[in-house]
Design a protein with these regions (language model features):
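Pre-P-loop entry segment of helicase/translocase ATPase cores
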Residues: 1-53, 261-262
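Conserved Walker A/P-loop ATP-binding site and its immediately adjacent core
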Residues: 79-101
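ASCE P-loop NTPase helicase motor core
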Residues: 97, 101-103, 143, 151-222
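Hydrophobic residues on the short alpha-helix immediately C-terminal to a glycine-rich phosphate/catalytic loop
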Residues: 48, 67, 71-75, 95, ...
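ATPase catalytic-site recognition across NTP-hydrolyzing enzymes
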Residues: 205-263
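Walker A/P-loop
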Residues: 50-71
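Inter-Walker segment of RecA-like/P-loop motor cores
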Residues: 93-142
């Protein structure tokens, strides 16, 4: 085997054995330059909760769709079926486009594709659909990806419809920026019980060095409440409430910290 061919073969083997290396390869294809995964992206790519779920609370523009698309490609390589839900059709098309881009960095071939569905020669399928109880029934999946979970309409109805589609041992990946406290995604973080088969990841914009300039720009342009929600990933009381619930909770707390002001 010529040296160049051997080098290519070894590089491809490394990516197959190391999902993070594969993810970085996909990013480089998309960005047109070398890319390195953030620590949280490594955690999300490697997260393995058979029969359970991983919930990712992530700031805007941090790269969560890249992680979800990579999880989709990894499942295609195994010949599995992935269902990806998003609040709107535009978002389903965008993540399908990203999966198609990443597939060009693999040895798989596409047998059939539409704007929201891809089938490969491994027998795997990636299907992206707008999240409504009516459109998602009837599928069976090995993996479920829910993008912008906090923004789903009728979220409890949608989740109730989709969870029975998972095969035994199938995994769910919820990803979103927070959008208030009164939704399914918020309850995953606020009401989690220790016995739940659920892994929680929180990624604030202030924790990502490559986003430092953008974070400072948003700090000056967004209201304090919006910055806390969009960048710091806090679950803020819904806009209908005149007072932020966290302020009310602190004011009514009987702890010394709440009663005695600090100067």
């Amino acid at each position: 085997m010529p040296f160049d061919a051997l080098d290519t073969w070894l590089t491809d083997l490394e990516r197959r054995l190391d999902p993070v290396a594969q993810f970085e390869h996909f990013l480089s294809l998309e960005l047109g330059r070398a890319a390195t995964a953030d620590p949280w992206q490594r955690d999300a790519i490697l997260s393995d909760v058979p029969g359970g779920a991983t919930a990712m609370r992530i700031c805007r523009q941090a790269g969560k769709s890249c992680v979800l698309a990579t999880r989709g490609v990894m499942a295609l390589e195994r010949g599995e079926v992935t269902i990806c839900l998003a609040p709107a059709e535009r978002q389903t098309r965008e993540i399908t486009r990203k999966v198609a881009t990443y597939l060009r960095g693999t040895t798989m071939t596409v047998e059939r594709s539409t704007m929201t569905e891809i089938e490969t020669n491994t027998g795997g399928r990636f299907i992206a659909v707008p999240a409504s109880g009516a459109t998602i029934r009837g599928f069976t999946a090995d993996q479920l990806l829910v993008d912008e979970c906090a923004y789903l309409t009728n979220d409890e109805e949608v989740i109730t419809a989709v969870l029975p589609m998972l095969k035994d041992g199938g995994q769910v990946f919820y990803a979103s920026t927070p959008a208030g406290k009164n939704n399914f995604f918020a309850r995953l973080f606020l009401d989690t019980k220790p016995s739940d088969a659920l892994r929680l990841l929180t990624v604030r914009g202030t924790q990502i060095p490559r986003m430092a300039a953008k974070v400072e720009r948003l700090r000056t342009q967004l209201s304090q409440t919006k910055f806390r929600q969009e960048v710091e990933c806090e679950f803020i009381a819904d806009g209908q409430a005149y007072f932020d619930l966290s302020v009310i909770e602190a004011a009514t707390s009987k702890t010394e910290a709440a009663i005695v002001p600090k100067f």
